[in-house]
């Protein structure tokens, strides 16, 4: 029997240790994870894969709300399958780096949306201040519309380099299966394309447009793609758009016409959860609303809370943990007036708890503002609450203070967080 290099790497103990640690963080059932720590379980899986008897179970669908009020269908795998597919996804990225173009930034360790947005802002500043500078676009139902032949071709390339593998057979079989359970637990059949929600969908989403990424990145301008979001800034932006549409048509795909936007240096536009205007970066409208909701539910919408409890809850949300709000937002957003508006809203929520008067207005988004994009709806109790309470809130460190700490060093920031 020929050696199966990919399967050997798949069952490397280091891969499983990392995957099980991820599983704990993702709240996969502990009894399932414990089973996977047993060597006999993994040996049985390997034996079944070699014999062609191992199958990924049909997923069940879930509806995830989108910013526009619609819902996105995702395919959720069973707990053990999530671990298996997660390892397979990591392995595919490791085995085939040449299938991933440098202009594609999604789903890769160490490259978050913030880094991409910061780079885009710098490029906007370098390009100039007048007229149309480029475009941003969104693929229409990318995860649902890629024909199976392109998915097969991606797996073919892996085996052409590393040899035939039982693991790739498992993945092919799963991607050729149309079976799933709907939200009412009814057994259904429908072509699922990349199967959004499946871990391997992230690798496929990155590599399937390699040729397009390469072609657009060679034009006169700056091109970047994050999954199904694309952006081009530079002189060749019209040529780039024509090429993009032609190449997508060749693959039976298309752009979402509602999401194509031409960019100017003096108008805010939204990209990857942020808003950009030249060298200025702030939050997108959906992220502003999420911020308001998260602060309110820990303060003025939390029954029987006290100021001390609310301050602790808000500090945890804003500052504590590796993936806290501050870590994701503050190194990227550079519009001080917008950050001040967010901070004033937080402090007004704290003051409302002290006075019991909670009509304090909300936060909004205006893309035509010259110096920012966040606006505040003034509530009738704001001025009175400020007059009746102290200027400082005990135990709360302001957004501006924590941003300065983060920009100084992560160690300074961590010291302040530890003091809360």
Give, region by region, the residue ranges found by the protein language model.
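Non-catalytic, polymerase-adjacent accessory regions of viral genome-replication enzymes
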Residues: 1-44, 357, 400-420
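Active-site-proximal segment of RNA-dependent polymerases
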Residues: 3, 89-147
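Glycine-/proline-rich flexible loop or hinge segments
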Residues: 21-33, 64-75, 101-103
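Reverse-transcriptase-like RNA-dependent polymerase core
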Residues: 47-69, 83, 168-184
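Conserved pre-motif C helix in the palm subdomain of viral-like polymerases
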Residues: 70-101, 190-217
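Right-hand nucleic-acid polymerase module
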Residues: 82, 86, 185, 189, ...
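Conserved polymerase palm-domain catalytic core
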Residues: 123-227, 231-247, 251-253, 257-258, ...
């Amino acid at each position: 029997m020929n050696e199966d290099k990919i399967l050997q790497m798949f069952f490397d103990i280091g891969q499983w240790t990392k995957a099980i640690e991820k599983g704990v963080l993702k709240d996969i059932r502990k009894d399932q994870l414990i089973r996977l720590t047993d060597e006999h379980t993994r040996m049985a899986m390997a034996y079944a894969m070699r014999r062609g008897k191992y199958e990924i179970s049909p997923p069940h669908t879930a509806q995830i709300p989108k910013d526009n009020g619609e819902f996105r269908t995702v395919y959720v795998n069973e707990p053990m399958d999530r671990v298996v597919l997660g390892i397979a996804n990591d392995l595919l990225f490791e085995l085939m780096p040449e299938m991933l173009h440098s202009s594609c930034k999604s789903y890769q360790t160490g490259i978050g949306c913030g880094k991409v947005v910061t780079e885009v802002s710098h490029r906007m500043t370098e390009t100039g201040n007048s007229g149309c500078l480029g475009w941003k676009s969104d693929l229409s139902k990318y995860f649902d519309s890629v024909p199976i032949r392109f998915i097969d071709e991606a797996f073919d390339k892996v085996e052409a380099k590393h040899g035939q593998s039982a693991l790739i057979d498992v993945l092919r079989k799963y991607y050729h299966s149309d079976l799933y359970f709907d939200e009412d637990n009814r057994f259904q059949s429908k072509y699922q394309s990349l199967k959004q929600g499946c871990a391997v969908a992230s690798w496929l989403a990155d590599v399937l447009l390699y040729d397009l990424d390469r072609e657009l990145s060679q034009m006169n301008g700056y091109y970047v793609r994050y999954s199904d979001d694309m952006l081009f800034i530079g002189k060749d932006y019209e040529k780039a758009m024509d090429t993009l549409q032609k190449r997508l048509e060749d693959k039976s795909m298309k752009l979402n016409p509602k999401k194509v936007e031409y960019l100017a240096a003096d108008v805010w536009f939204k990209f990857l959860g942020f808003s950009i205007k030249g060298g200025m970066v702030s939050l997108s409208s959906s992220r502003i609303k999420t911020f308001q909701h998260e602060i309110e539910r820990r303060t003025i919408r939390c029954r029987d809370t006290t100021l001390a409890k609310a301050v602790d809850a808000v500090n945890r949300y804003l500052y504590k943990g590796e993936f806290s709000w501050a870590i994701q937002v503050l190194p990227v957003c550079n519009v001080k007036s917008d950050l001040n508006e967010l901070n004033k809203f937080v402090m007004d929520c704290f003051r409302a708890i002290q006075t019991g008067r909670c009509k304090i207005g909300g936060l909004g988004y205006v893309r035509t503002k010259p110096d920012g994009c966040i606006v505040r709806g003034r509530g009738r109790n704001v001025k009175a609450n400020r007059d009746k309470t102290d200027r400082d809130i005990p135990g709360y460190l302001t957004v501006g203070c924590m941003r300065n700490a983060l920009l100084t060093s992560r160690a300074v920031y961590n010291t302040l967080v530890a003091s809360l």
